[in-house]
């Protein structure tokens, strides 16, 4: 079995570091770091998630309450759901606590709506099929776009599309980009694109102008 490690201050545990700012007592708790690699090898992922769930079950069997910290909302592309589903199947009592989705927070920081009236809204993991997803009607949100920055930016420029982007939303290192031209070729993992078609409301407003 892979070794689990204590999640200590200098580890890159984003959710843990955020919680420490508002709940200092977390340092008094037993904190375990469960590796969640961002890979596409399905068999390897199943093995890792099975091990992580079994390890968590051991803590529950000791009579302890276990909290899985995650950023954003746990129901949206969150690694915690892989553990949650397994524990639920094993008969343990589980509960999901809703959070603020990154794309809602990003839209608020950019001071824009995500959709209006009959506009469609598409939430897309940027690591899968950027070009195909761009053909969707309505607002496209590409989450965790850091590794696909160059590809997304190139497609936007080649097709004369306007986009906005937020990097590290809500963090000290947050950066806002209000146009395709401003968006860099490279950015961090927590980069989120918002690409909007012109909505009917906007068209009506433009006609009024």
Q: Language-model features: where?
A:
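Short, small-residue-biased leader/transition segments that mark boundaries at the very start
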Residues: 3-8
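P-loop/Walker A phosphate-binding loop and immediately adjacent motor/lid segment at beta-alpha junctions
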Residues: 9-43, 158-166
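General beta-strand structural signal in soluble alpha/beta enzymes
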Residues: 33, 68-70, 96-99, 165-166
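Conserved Motif II region of HX4D acyltransferases
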Residues: 62-77
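Class I SAM-dependent methyltransferase SAM-binding "motif I" and its flanking Rossmann-like core
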Residues: 75-136, 184, 198-201
């Amino acid at each position: 079995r892979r070794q689990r490690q204590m999640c200590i201050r200098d580890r890159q545990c984003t959710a843990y570091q955020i919680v420490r700012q508002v709940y200092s007592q977390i340092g008094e708790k037993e904190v375990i770091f469960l590796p969640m690699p961002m890979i596409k090898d399905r068999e390897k992922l199943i093995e890792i998630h099975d091990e992580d769930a079994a390890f968590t079950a051991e803590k529950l069997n000791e009579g302890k309450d276990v909290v899985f910290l995650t950023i954003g909302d746990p129901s949206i592309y969150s690694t915690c759901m892989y553990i949650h589903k397994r524990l639920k199947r094993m008969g343990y009592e589980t509960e999901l606590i809703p959070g603020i989705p990154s794309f809602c927070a990003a839209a608020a920081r950019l001071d824009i709506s995500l959709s209006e009236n009959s506009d469609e809204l598409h939430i897309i993991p940027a690591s899968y099929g950027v070009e195909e997803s761009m053909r969707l009607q309505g607002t496209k949100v590409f989450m965790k776009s850091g590794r696909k920055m160059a590809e997304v930016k190139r497609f936007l420029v080649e097709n004369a599309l306007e986009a906005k982007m937020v990097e590290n939303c809500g963090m000290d290192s947050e950066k806002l980009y209000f146009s395709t031209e401003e968006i860099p070729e490279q950015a961090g993992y927590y980069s989120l694109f918002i690409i909007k078609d012109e909505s009917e409301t906007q068209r009506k407003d433009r006609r009024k102008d």
